[in-house]
């Protein structure tokens, strides 16, 4: 190969290596609202959020200068995942480099979630963000923007920084803090800055850019397979209610149990027996009414409650001896172990399989814990009457676990659900829940002991290798924190509005999941139950709507099995990036040609000079 050609090739390679990475890289920025702790309390602060996206493998990197008061790493990872899910993009082909800079230490954590998600969507979709706007709020499953603290201080800081508009979570215009109430609309008018509400990530992106990123679904396309299975499950449980009711109807509790109650120190009158019977009857009626409305999960829940009451009555009527009670406990323990072994052997392939496995195993775990309580009561008091309800609960929980197992093996998209992937999802969810808990404790300290305990239970399941239960338990812990956040500082009269708004978001999220071919059986079940509770128990409705959100988006932690690898040029890189890449390539080629031209020119000039000198020497 001639030397000039060789040099040309080397030069082209070097130029390509230098230019191509810059062509791939994309950078973005937005202002970040935060609070900082001072001697006089919390004050608003402004930080800068930067994001650079480069070809990679889906990794997330975060740098903060200076360090933030709360850990922001998991919020960043979760916000990235929600952003990718919102635009239905597989982000495993790029790495995300986030940087947060501020003049002094700030409290970021979960409250930065909405900003991170908005910036991520804008970068991936190649949308220009309005730099004079900012947003504050957590980002939750389904793209819900959740409440945060310090809103008054953040709005004031935004005005001071010259921003024109601030987006806050919906329902947060009235702020209660330090025994005072602030209307942010009135505050914003006085300051000369606009404040707007945003419920979801799609609303926020539209507010920043005018562009819609998510389709709105009017109704949920309920999976017929789900309907048929849940209807059958509810029918089985409600048929059992009628069977147990018939068995309990003819028992004489006064003779068999209540007559001896005074000597036992419990159930000293027949009114408590009647209360059990009345409650069972009321739950049976509710179960039947829900079934007629085709609210099958709610029907199953009510009938399960009735079954526990009826079974308790039957056990009380039997007046079991200690030996008989121990025998029943041993029998149930064996049945739980056998059923769990069957469950472990099942090869989970779909999100429905995963959720059915979670639902069944949760019930088996609760049954086992209930049996342990029954044995503890029996050993402490030596009286079988006190363990009747816990024994009945264990028996009925085992029965409902069997019912939920009927969802296993249904059709659906196959996902990679191996142990390593499940373990990672569990660890991520624990970190998300713990980070969210730390954030809430900044504003309402020493109030989340029960949630701390739940996160601890998730950690225990992680240690035991029960990754599915770990994922579910941690998801519910996070939902518990989000529920507290959603009502923190809000007047009780607004709870109903919050519930309605949240349920509408849940409905849209489930509809979207169903449209993707992933019907979330747990998410929809909790959504249905929350709807049934919103008039009678609004706080429980809020809690179950949070459960529906968390357990309705489990697919963001998993990848579809056997999904073909997409080519970077044709699918993974957006059109603008492709144009940039092509332009960089042409630039490199042209630069190489010009460089090669001058090299060649110099080379041949030198060659001619050398020949001329050689001829002169020869003549001499």
What kind of region is each of these model predictions?
Residues 312-315, 319, 323-399, 403-424, ...:
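Long, low-complexity or tandemly repetitive, helically biased scaffold regions used
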Residues 570-587:
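Juxtamembrane/start-of-transmembrane alpha-helix segments at the extracytoplasmic/lumenal side
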Residues 24-281, 285, 317, 326, ...:
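Peripheral, non-AAA+ core regions of ATP-driven protein-machinery
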Residues 604-620:
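Cytoplasmic C-terminal tails of single-pass
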Residues 588-605:
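Alpha-helical transmembrane segments
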Residues 9-18:
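Bacterial N-terminal signal peptides
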Residues 288-317, 378-409, 459-486, 537-557:
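Charged, amphipathic alpha-helical scaffolding segments
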Residues 465-573:
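Membrane-proximal extracellular "stem/stalk" segments
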């Amino acid at each position: 190969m001639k030397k000039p050609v060789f040099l040309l090739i080397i030069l082209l390679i070097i130029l390509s290596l230098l230019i191509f990475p810059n062509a791939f890289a994309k950078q973005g920025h937005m202002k970040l609202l935060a609070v900082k702790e001072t001697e006089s309390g919390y004050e608003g602060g402004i930080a800068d959020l930067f994001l650079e996206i480069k070809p990679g493998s889906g990794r997330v990197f975060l740098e903060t200068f200076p360090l933030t008061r709360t850990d922001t790493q998991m919020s960043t990872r979760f916000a990235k995942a929600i952003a990718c899910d919102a635009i239905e993009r597989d982000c495993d082909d790029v790495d995300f480099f986030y940087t947060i800079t501020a003049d002094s230490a700030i409290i970021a954590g979960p409250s930065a979630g909405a900003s991170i998600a908005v910036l991520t969507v804008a970068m991936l979709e190649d949308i220009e963000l309005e730099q004079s706007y900012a947003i504050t709020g957590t980002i939750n499953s389904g793209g819900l923007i959740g409440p945060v603290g310090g809103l008054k201080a953040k709005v004031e800081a935004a005005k001071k920084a010259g921003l024109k508009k601030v987006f806050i979570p919906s329902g947060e215009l009235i702020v209660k803090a330090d025994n005072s109430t602030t209307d942010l609309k009135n505050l914003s008018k006085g300051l000369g800055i606009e404040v707007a509400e945003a419920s979801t990530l799609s609303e926020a992106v539209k507010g920043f850019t005018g562009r819609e990123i998510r389709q709105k679904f009017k109704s949920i396309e309920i999976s017929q397979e789900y309907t048929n299975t849940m209807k059958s499950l509810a029918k089985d449980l409600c048929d059992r209610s009628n069977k147990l009711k018939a068995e309990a109807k003819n028992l004489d509790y006064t003779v068999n149990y209540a007559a001896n109650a005074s000597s036992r120190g419990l159930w000293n009158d027949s009114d408590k027996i009647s209360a059990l019977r009345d409650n069972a009857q009321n739950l049976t009626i509710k179960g039947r009414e829900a079934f007629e409305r085709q609210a099958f999960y709610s029907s199953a829940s009510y009938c399960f409650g009735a079954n526990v009451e009826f079974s308790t009555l039957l056990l009380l009527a039997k007046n079991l001896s200690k030996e008989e009670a121990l025998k029943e406990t041993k029998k149930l323990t064996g049945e739980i172990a056998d059923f769990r072994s069957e469950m472990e052997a099942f090869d989970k392939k779909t999100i429905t399989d995963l959720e059915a496995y979670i639902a069944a195993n949760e019930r088996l775990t609760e049954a086992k814990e209930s049996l342990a309580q029954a044995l503890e009561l029996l050993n402490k008091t030596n009286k079988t009457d006190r363990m009747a309800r816990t024994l009945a609960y264990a028996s009925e929980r085992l029965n409902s676990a069997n019912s939920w197992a009927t969802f296993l093996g249904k059709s659906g998209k196959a996902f990679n659900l191996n142990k390593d992937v499940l373990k990672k999802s569990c660890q991520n969810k624990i970190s998300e829940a713990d980070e969210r808990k730390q954030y809430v404790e900044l504003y309402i300290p020493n109030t989340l002991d029960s949630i701390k305990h739940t996160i601890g239970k998730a950690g225990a399941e992680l240690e035991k290798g029960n990754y599915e239960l770990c994922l579910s338990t941690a998801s519910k812990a996070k939902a518990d924190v989000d529920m507290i956040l959603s009502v923190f500082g809000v007047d009780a009269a607004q709870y109903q509005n919050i519930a309605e708004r949240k349920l509408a978001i849940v409905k849209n999220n489930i509809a979207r999941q169903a449209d993707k071919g992933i019907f979330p059986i747990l998410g929809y079940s909790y959504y249905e139950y929350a709807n049934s509770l919103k008039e009678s128990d609004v706080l429980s409705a809020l809690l179950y709507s949070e459960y529906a959100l968390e357990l309705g988006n489990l697919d963001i932690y998993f990848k579809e099995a056997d999904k073909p690898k997409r080519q970077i040029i044709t699918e993974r890189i957006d059109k603008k990036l492709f144009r940039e890449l092509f332009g960089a390539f042409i630039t490199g080629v042209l630069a190489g040609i010009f460089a090669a031209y001058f090299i060649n020119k110099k080379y041949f000039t030198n060659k001619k000079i050398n020949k001329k000198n050689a001829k002169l020497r020869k003549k001499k």
